[in-house]
Amino acid sequence: MRENAMSTKKLPYKLSGSSKITTSIPNDLIILRNNCINSLNSSSSKADSITCIDTWLKYTEGLLTHRYEANNDAALIEEEIAIALINVAVFYQDIGIETLYRAYESSQASNNLWTTSGTYLKRGLGLICFLGKNFQINTANDCQKMQVLNVLNQLSLEFQLLQQLGIVVLALSKLRSKISKDAVADLEPQELEELGKSSVFYAKLCIGSYSTASQCQGGRIVDALFMNYLQSLTYLFLSINQYNNDECGIAIGMLQESIKKLLNIVPNSQLKELDILSSTDITKKRDLIKMSFKRKIHGSTLKNQRIFEKKVPFSSKAYMMPLLKSSLDDFVIPLTILLRYRYQTTNENYSFKTVETDVSKLKELFPRGKSSDIEGTVWSFQDGHLTFADSNNATHNCGNYF
């Protein structure tokens, strides 16, 4: 395979123009192969990724036809098929992430983009399953075979993680529509109570996602910022539940830990409003909170970014997926400001609870994580074409997901 092939970080694979396989396949396949090579020279926008899927599927179908008609299961052919299928799965992953980002940016929790994103992820996972079930992955040596199997395993975990992340981000979108609708300067008791009913469930999703993400480190999805993001949300959601249980000291402790995780992601200046909340000027506090919730991330801010483009939040070594950064800027940070104000006001005037700062004690209150398995779309190869269940075309007919 390729250097560092055991990780998904370098995906999609690039084909060599001087590969030995060009002497083993007919001219029409060489043309399709060159099209694949050229496709990776373009950007990774949604339209380009769809083009890549079409281009690489045609090459894969040609390879599969050649394999079966010529009864050619040579290691080079098998390895090329594996590379092509893995790349198509990666393109589906890219489109799934981008569509998820667009769904969140649309500010409508009920739009079809959530469903479309899940469909793309299912198709990508389905190709990984198709490759694992239908091929012995005969490669030049056992080491290369293990590399392919390890990549398939890591990609499967990443697809599962992205499905879980989709549910978490959808939850944030729903919460955003409830809280920021009137740009309130404070949450009414019934609003916090309503949030508390689902906050533990959302925390369980974050904990489950964190567990899955721990198995995906070093790949193309998970990094330290991703892990801090999930931890921050976990503490944030659990703080709401503790507040509703009249455990204001624990709620503040949970929120403080959430803020610590945020400070590993965003610059201190982005959270400077938290310091202003210590002011005794009530009017200033309320104006600040209103301003936080009225801020909007304009669609053009991240619109033209590539899915894995390195966007620097605050240092040359720190990068973050646009989807995660958008949810932080647009909702999580303003919500944190709002909750801290509410928790502190309640504790200083009514509860008088000692703030819990022992992280080990806070973690003892964590519920068991919740994970949801994603089933990949069933693919098959018939009459020279790769198709999935209930479809005659590999780029249309989106199904249900969230």
Curated annotation (Swiss-Prot):
- Please indicate which superkingdom the organism of origin belongs to: Eukaryota
Database matches in InterPro entries: DUF5355
Which GO CC terms are listed, alphabetically?
cytoplasm; nucleus; plasma membrane
* Span of the signal peptide: none
What processes does the entry annotate via GO biological process terms? negative regulation of transcription by RNA polymerase II; nuclear-transcribed mRNA catabolic process, non-stop decay
The disulfide bridges present are none
Protein's name in the database: Uncharacterized protein YGR122W
Q: What is the lineage of its organism?
A: Eukaryota, Fungi, Dikarya, Ascomycota, Saccharomycotina
